[in-house]
Amino acid sequence: MAPDHPVYRLILDRALSGSHPELRRDKYKLGLVIEGGAMRGVVSAGMVAGLESLGLRRVFDVVYGASAGAFNGAYFLAGQAAFGTTIYYENLNTKNFINFWRLFQGKPVVNLEYVLKKVLVEEKPLHWPSVLNSPIPLKIVVSSLKMLKPVLLSGFKNKEELFEALYATAKMPLLSGGPVEIGGDRFLDAGLFQSIPVFAALEDGCTHMLILLTRPQGSRRKKSTLWDKYLFARLINRWQKGLGDCYLRMPDTYNECLSFIDQKEKDQERGPFLISLSLPADYLPLSRLEKNAELLRRAATESQNLVCRILQNRL
């Protein structure tokens, strides 16, 4: 992408002028949009670590996170992005988090309680007061079962509200159990409706967006399988009528979002302005349940280096 892209220009102008969220000299709203994807989230974790190393946190006005991307956004706003990246290859890649044997015990394969109660509190403690007090709000995308659409959760008043939203956005259907109840609604993983919270950021008024993708450049999701259609969708539909159809549309919804990003990236004349960062097309995609520490660590390093290489040359 051209070095004079409007998103890069805004990041550069704000970085060099010392602009910060509480004293902006421009009229724009720059959002950091972070994709998740379970263990693929290590990619966007490495990217926010790169932004942190360049001292670029203060150039953003809002951070939007979906699924694992919300966790990465929280560590980023706490000033712990590099620290937070290590959870993928030191904590989450263990049987404490992913354990297929739990199926035989009638329990979810993915143990989110371990993340919220152990990793974020004891093993790799998130400094949550910094997230709550940040002048840059964290807005977390979740999937509402009541409305069958994505919803933004924000304005967290305490640790419990923040962790509850993180729990909901990462609640993968079936793999990590059933819906999470918050305020009279039930929520599941953001990926049901919006794995990449671009449209949420647009509706929230962003004029510029830096989008961190966790799949290699040019990747697209494959169509739903017969297993999806005749088993998983029917199971999920028990939670809410119509939810199974939403589940089956996930690949199309995701691919349409990527096509929209591709189209908008090329338009440097009319806003809103979007630009995305992703690993090269020939990079081997990670599984969302990847447990190989070496592959995860390498993905984090490559992603951090990518961000530094692209943005450092412009600063």
Where is each model-derived feature located?
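Patatin-like phospholipase
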Residues: 1-63, 74-315
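Gly/Ala-rich beta-loop-alpha elbow adjacent to hydrolase catalytic centers
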Residues: 65, 69
